[in-house]
């Protein structure tokens, strides 16, 4: 695990302990049970693929550790509606506060403003967080293999499946990919950002895609800015993408989303 991930794990475990002291697991489960049924994150992405279209998981992200504030006029419901109008299949909403200025209410508000399924984008370590995600309305959770043991990942995946949620498993290298393939979820995200150096290169997706069976749905993450980037990754069998910062920086998010997915409205600026 990188030093960055270790620091995140430290504050995350403190957060989880504090949350458990405020809201019992029983109360959290009751809140989750009151939510409407999960919308089908994986199903929405497969539908785009079946229609011969690129599938986009559009990210709602206010800030990042490396770039600071990304979007000053941050309005999750408006962004969710803009992404939906632009043709996105799903949402990804940051709920981590210390590193990304995210919040649970951003997830709930964004999902309520559209018909798209939503991913809770956060660092998951405890099954309590899975119930939090469902209580806030999430349809999918993220598991980052770089920060989890095989047993931890399996436990979190099982908990999510029990709640009817989908699971996006994120990998960065061949070893993590091999471990991820032991899990059940058909959703596998390849992050093109090296968590140790923070360098980004689409070669990571191109290299790792060949290690993954055809029945998995591959998601390219990080470093995707243009329709041409999407076309490049499509040659490696990747037609679904998670994109945030490059879209979040645009004044017209709907137009930028359409441009990314169809190539009809120009090029997105690089980070």
Curated annotation (Swiss-Prot):
Alphabetical keyword list: Amino-acid biosynthesis, Aromatic amino acid biosynthesis, Decarboxylase, Lyase, Tryptophan biosynthesis
EC number: 4.1.1.48
SUPFAM superfamilies: Ribulose-phoshate binding barrel (SSF51366)
Primary enzyme class: lyase
Pathway: Amino-acid biosynthesis; L-tryptophan biosynthesis; L-tryptophan from chorismate: step 4/5
Annotated source species: Agrobacterium fabrum (strain C58 / ATCC 33970) (Agrobacterium tumefaciens (strain C58))
InterPro entries registered for this protein in UniProt: Aldolase_TIM, Indole-3-glycerol_P_synth, Indole-3-glycerol_P_synth_dom, Indole-3-GlycerolPSynthase_CS, RibuloseP-bd_barrel
Name this polypeptide is given: Indole-3-glycerol phosphate synthase
UniProt entry tagged with the keyword Amino-acid biosynthesis: yes
Gene: trpC
Pfam family, one: IGPS
GO molecular-function terms, A-Z: indole-3-glycerol-phosphate synthase activity; phosphoribosylanthranilate isomerase activity
Membership in a protein family: Belongs to the TrpC family.
Transmembrane residue ranges: none
Domain of life of the organism encoding this protein: Bacteria
CDD domains: IGPS (cd00331)
A single BP term in Gene Ontology: L-tryptophan biosynthetic process
Keyword flag Lyase: yes
Gene3D superfamilies given in the database record: Aldolase class I
Catalytic activity, as annotated: 1-(2-carboxyphenylamino)-1-deoxy-D-ribulose 5-phosphate + H(+) = (1S,2R)-1-C-(indol-3-yl)glycerol 3-phosphate + CO2 + H2O
């Amino acid at each position: 695990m990188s030093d960055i991930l270790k620091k995140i794990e430290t504050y995350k475990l403190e957060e989880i302990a504090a949350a458990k002291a405020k809201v019992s697991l029983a109360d959290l489960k009751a809140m989750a049970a009151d939510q409407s049924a999960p919308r089908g994150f994986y199903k929405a992405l497969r539908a785009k693929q079946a229609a011969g279209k690129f599938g986009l998981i559009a990210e709602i992200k206010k800030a990042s550790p490396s770039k600071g504030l990304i979007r000053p006029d941050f309005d999750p419901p408006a962004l969710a509606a803009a992404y939906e109008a632009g043709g996105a299949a799903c949402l990804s909403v940051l709920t981590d506060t210390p590193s990304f200025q995210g919040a649970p209410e951003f997830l709930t508000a964004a999902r309520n403003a559209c018909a798209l399924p939503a991913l809770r984008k956060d660092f998951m370590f405890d099954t309590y967080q899975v119930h939090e995600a469902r209580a806030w309305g999430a349809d999918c959770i993220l598991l980052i293999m770089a920060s989890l043991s095989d047993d931890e990942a399996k436990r979190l995946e099982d908990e999510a499946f029990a709640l009817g949620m989908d699971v996006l498993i994120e990998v960065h290298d061949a070893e993590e990919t091999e471990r991820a393939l032991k899990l059940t979820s058909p959703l596998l995200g390849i992050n093109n950002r090296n968590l140790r150096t923070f360098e980004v290169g689409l070669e990571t997706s191109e290299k790792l895609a060949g290690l993954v069976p055809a029945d998995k749905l591959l998601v390219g993450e990080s470093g995707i800015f243009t329709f041409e980037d999407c076309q490049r990754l499509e040659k490696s069998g990747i037609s679904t993408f998670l994109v945030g910062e490059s879209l979040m920086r645009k004044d017209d998010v709907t137009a930028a989303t359409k441009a990314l997915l169809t190539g009809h409205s120009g090029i997105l600026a690089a980070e």
